[in-house]
Design a protein with these regions (language model features):
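Residue-level detector of alpha-helix boundary/anchor positions
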Residues: 132, 164, 357-360
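Short alpha-helical "patches" and their helix-cap loops
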Residues: 96-101, 167-168, 309-310, 325-331
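Transmembrane alpha-helices and membrane-interface helical segments
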Residues: 146-157, 182-187, 310-326, 372-383
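Aromatic-enriched
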Residues: 317-401
């Protein structure tokens, strides 16, 4: 089935290219209801524009005039090693193409689809509106999807090499830390030490660069549309209703952590044979689910980050076809929620033609995002190997000598 997946992916990319050639660049993106900017690959231009601002003597964390949107540069300081290489706005298109090639190349390689249903689901997510948004913007997360996949594949050859790729990803973008589930295994071994090492490294990294991290979080654009996260719906209601909508800021966090606790509890109570799938697909699920749940808890994340849910698809495609069990029902609901979330822009285009209809479609999307959050957390816990729970139990009941 691997060849079928690669062929399907290639045909999909070729069809988009042909559509752009005959129908037009902007018109093609609008088929998915993607907001198109005059300047293509807008997100990669944050990097090339910042490099040019830096070269001209500006501090891009305060004033970034060579970025098309004059956006403040809010990446970790280590990015300056790359920015000082002399890249400028002319490099935007080559960098965008390289990012897309890297993304689609690793996407072609990593999954082990079991059947045609898995390929259908992979295709539906790959060419969904949420992911088309990431391609149109050429968002840098395309590179970090690739680095996560590379870390996953290297683990089958060299754990230290995989760990090095993971650490570099964390240094440049932080959130790949949530993918450390790739260092789990069906059988007990020493690989989880790499996950512990990644957590320890990140804690030290935060301690050393704390002021930079605070600046990053405070200046990151937080959307209330084309976004997912625990704050998104509440920010939207506050923006549309104004003073009529006022709740304590703790409420979204309380709701998210209550759902998290319930998902962990029921996932633990109803563990089943979810580990009875290919190990690579299982590790990919832990990585993708970890990134979605982790970034959801950060508050606001743009929809292009749904690209990481691709990592969950091969496992989900197998689980939904299993027979019986609460975990299988949750897996099926999770797949439905994933498809609704990824295709939200299309649903909005078709049905959100009035303010009232738009709000209904928006509400459906938010319900899907929260359902996906619960479902992926539940399945993450339910799919963890039994030896891990045994080790945790032994650690908790261990008596001091």
């Amino acid at each position: 089935m691997k060849r079928v997946w690669v062929a399907t992916l290639s045909v999909g990319i070729a069809l988009i290219g042909l559509c752009m050639y005959f129908y037009g660049y902007e018109n093609t993106w609008r088929l998915w209801n993607i907001p198109v900017f005059k300047s293509p690959f807008l997100d990669i231009q944050l990097i090339t524009g910042t490099a040019e601002s830096l070269e001209k003597g500006f501090d891009p964390t305060v004033n970034n005039p060579y970025d098309p949107g004059h956006r403040i540069f809010n990446y970790p300081k280590v990015w300056y090693l790359f920015l000082n290489l002399g890249i400028g706005r002319r490099a935007a298109v080559p960098l965008a193409i390289a990012s897309l090639v890297l993304f689609f190349g690793t996407l072609a390689v990593f999954p082990k689809p079991k059947d045609k249903f898995a390929i259908l689901l992979l295709t539906a997510v790959t060419f969904s509106a949420a992911l088309m948004l990431s391609y149109e913007r050429a968002n840098v997360d395309l590179v970090f999807f690739a680095s996560t996949v590379i870390a996953l594949l290297l683990l089958e050859v060299s754990a230290p090499a995989s760990f090095l790729v993971m650490i570099l990803s964390i240094v440049f973008k932080i959130f790949p830390l949530f993918a450390i589930g790739i260092y789990l295994d069906k059988r007990k071994n020493k690989l989880p030490m790499y996950a512990i090492g990644a957590i320890a490294f990140t804690a030290l990294y935060f301690a050393v660069t704390w002021q930079n991290m605070k600046h990053i979080f405070s200046t990151t654009q937080k959307g209330n549309d084309l976004s997912y996260g625990l704050m998104v719906a509440f920010d939207y209601m506050e923006a549309t209703m104004g003073a009529a909508f006022s709740i304590p800021s703790i409420v979204p966090y309380a709701l998210a952590f209550v759902l998290l606790g319930l998902a962990v509890y029921f996932g633990f109570r109803q563990r089943s044979q979810l580990t009875d799938i290919d190990l690579r697909n299982l590790r990919a699920f832990w990585a993708g689910a970890g990134i979605y749940v982790g970034t959801f808890l950060l508050g606001n994340s743009w929809d292009y980050r749904f690209m990481f849910t691709l990592l969950t698809v091969p496992a989900l495609a197998e689980w939904v076809r299993h027979k019986g069990g609460g975990a299988i029902i949750i897996a099926r609901i999770t797949v439905i929620a994933l498809l609704i979330s990824c295709w939200y822009l299309i649903v909005q285009k078709w049905f959100g033609t009035t303010n009232a209809a738009y709000n209904v479609v928006y509400a459906i999307d938010e319900i899907a995002n929260w359902t996906l959050y619960f479902g992926l957390t539940y399945l993450y816990i339910a799919s963890l190997p039994q030896w891990l729970f045994d080790e945790l139990h032994n650690f908790l009941i261990r008596k001091p000598r």
